[in-house]
Structures are given as structure tokens and as C-alpha cells.
Curated annotation (Swiss-Prot):
It comes from the Bacteria. This is Vitamin B12 import system permease protein BtuC. Keywords: Cell inner membrane, Cell membrane, Membrane, Transmembrane, Transmembrane helix, Transport. GO terms for molecular function: vitamin transmembrane transporter activity. Part of the ABC transporter complex BtuCDF involved in vitamin B12 import. Involved in the translocation of the substrate across the membrane. It comes from Shigella flexneri serotype 5b (strain 8401). Pfam families: FecCD. GO terms for biological process: cobalamin transport. One of its GO terms (cellular component) is plasma membrane.
Length: 326
């Protein structure tokens, strides 16, 4: 038994090391790749100072943090709701951020600065989170809370569709592209949004013990003494914050929160002491690679990163499911 435990620990360490190396390679490639390839030896030239440090570095940091936040949010939701299909958009938080953004554009008549739009997106996500917490205070079961989130997401999606359909504003129509996900407008002015993600990410990565209890199921977690009401509220609030900030930075990006945790579980990473940091590393790496493809696929334009993640990730996910089912 002890030998099996040590073998599992060594395998977990190897996985984390491999994911760390993959993320470092993706970081280097993200800084080098673009319309002009800039090798590391040219990073401190005048051309490198402009393209690498002023344009590519803030974008790379945003992609890294958003990828980690979405993947960890997916892992948290899948444990909280005991559902492998749970993901950050499931509770309606992503759509709530979109409603906040569209409301800001309508009320501000397209004159609000980007930082104000970002704040409105976060506010929309937090409003949906507060509504969910209101439901949670009534001590609803996990399945009922999940259904409440799905219903809120449908309502927010309908509101966005109505607003965009009847709008004649060019800015509002351009938001449809933004809601498909993209990091094209990210620079150092959005650094406050990046900093807002770091404390929550680090805190959740340290909560492996309650997450392992939640993964056993609601009844087992209660029997082990876990205060379900407290942890449900805290985790829903933390997830709402991370998703709201991520949508404010890059729009709605699918696939990462759904598939990354599931892929790691198929690979044998079930302990949240390893799964949570593994999700952060794998989510960051996957989104960095998708961002590179989005930048380089077309010569005169940039693809929405949400389209890239779905196109590249869905076949891989299906292949892994078929492989696991054999």
C-alpha cells in the first residue's frame, strides 16, 4: 500500500513538472511569435522593447492568468456540483458579466472608457453571484442551486440577445466579437484586472482538503464535518469573481473550464492537491497555445480565441473519452 502511494506521488510530481515545462515553452513561444518573430536574443533591442515588453508581455500575462482562472473555476464547479459537465458558464456568471457590459454600453452610449466597461462586467458577474448566494442561504440542495444557475444563465443570454438584436449601435455589435473571446486590446492599462485574479487563484489552490471532501459527494462531506453552507457560499463567490474578471479581460471563453479538469482526471490526477495546480498550469498552457494560433492563423486579422479553443479542444476531448472508455 505504501509503495502504491509513493508511486502515485511520484507520478503526480512528474505530471506537474511536465505541465510546468509545457507552460514555460508556451510562454517563450508567446513572446517570440507574432507578425514579426523576435528571438530571446533580440528582446532588449529597441524593437524588442516595443513588441515584447509593451505589447506581447501584458497580453501573455493576461492569457496565462485567465487560462488558469477558468480551468480552476471548472475544477471547483465540478467538485461542488458533483457534475463532470460543470463549467464557469454553467451558473450564468459569464452571461451576467456580458449583461453588465452591454448595459454599460447602452447607458453610456459608447462613451465609457475600457476600465469602466471592465468594472461593469465584473459588477454583472457579482450580481449573479449574489443572487446565487441568496438561493444558497435558503439551504437549497446542490442540484437545485445548479438549476438556479442554469436558469439565470438562460435569462441573461436572452437579455443579451434582445439588446444586440434591436440595437443600431456599432459599438454594441462589435461586442459580439468581444464576447467570443479575445485578448487583442489587452495592455498594461488592464494590469489591475490581472492583479485582481492572483489572490483568489492562490487561495483556491490552497483549499485542497475541503475540495477533496466535496468531491466525495454532499452526504459524505457532511458526515466528515465539512460545513457545506459556508464552503458553498465561499466557492461560488470566488468562482464568480474569477469568471467576472476573466470576462472583463477577454470576453467569454469556453472549453477551458470544462475540458481541462476533465482531461487531467482522465490522466489520473484526482487528488485536488495536485489537480488544482495542475489545472492552473494546463489551463494557462492551453490558452497560451490557442492565443498563438489565433494570432498567426490569418495574416490580416485575428481569430476569436473562443473559436480556437473549441475547434482544437473538442476533438482532443472526444479522443480522450473514447480512449478512457476502452
Amino acid at each position: 500500500m505504501l509503495t502504491l502511494t509513493r508511486q502515485q506521488q511520484r507520478q503526480n510530481i512528474r505530471w506537474l513538472l511536465c505541465l510546468s515545462v509545457l507552460m514555460l515553452l508556451a510562454l517563450l513561444l508567446s513572446l517570440c511569435a507574432g507578425e514579426q518573430w523576435i528571438s530571446p536574443g533580440d528582446w532588449f533591442t529597441p524593437r524588442g522593447e516595443l513588441f515584447v515588453w509593451q505589447i506581447r508581455l501584458p497580453r501573455m500575462l493576461a492569457v496565462l492568468l485567465v487560462g488558469a482562472a477558468l480551468a480552476i473555476s471548472g475544477a471547483v464547479m465540478q467538485a461542488l456540483f458533483e457534475n463532470p459537465l460543470a463549467e464557469p458558464g454553467l451558473l450564468g456568471v459569464s452571461n451576467g458579466a456580458g449583461v453588465g457590459l452591454i448595459a454599460a454600453v447602452l447607458l453610456g452610449q459608447g462613451q465609457l472608457p475600457n476600465w469602466a466597461l471592465g468594472l461593469c462586467a465584473i459588477a454583472g458577474a457579482l450580481i449573479i453571484t449574489l443572487i446565487l448566494l441568496r438561493f444558497a442561504r435558503r439551504h437549497l440542495s446542490t442540484s437545485r442551486l445548479l438549476l438556479a444557475g442554469v436558469a439565470l444563465g438562460i435569462i441573461c443570454s436572452a437579455l443579451m440577445t434582445w439588446a444586440i438584436y434591436f440595437s443600431t449601435s456599432v459599438d454594441l455589435r462589435q461586442l459580439m466579437y468581444w464576447m467570443m473571446g479575445g485578448f487583442g486590446g489587452v495592455d498594461w492599462r488592464q494590469s489591475w484586472l490581472m492583479l485582481a485574479l492572483i489572490p483568489v487563484l492562490l487561495w483556491i489552490c490552497c483549499q485542497s482538503r475541503p475540495m477533496n471532501m466535496l468531491a466525495l459527494g454532499e452526504i459524505s462531506a457532511r458526515q466528515l464535518g465539512l460545513p457545506m453552507w459556508f464552503w458553498r457560499n465561499v466557492l461560488v463567490a470566488a468562482t464568480g469573481w474569477m469568471v467576472g474578471v476573466s470576462v472583463a479581460l477577454a470576453g467569454a471563453i469556453g472549453f477551458i473550464g470544462l475540458v481541462i479538469p476533465h482531461i487531467l482526471r482522465l490522466c489520473g490526477l484526482t487528488d485536488h492537491r495536485v489537480l488544482l495546480p495542475g489545472c492552473a498550469l494546463a489551463g494557462a498552457s492551453a490558452l497560451l497555445l490557442a492565443d498563438i494560433v489565433a494570432r498567426l492563423a490569418l495574416a490580416a486579422a485575428e481569430l476569436p480565441i473562443g473559436v480556437v479553443t473549441a475547434t482544437l479542444g473538442a476533438p482532443v476531448f472526444i479522443w480522450l473519452l473514447l480512449k478512457a472508455g476502452r
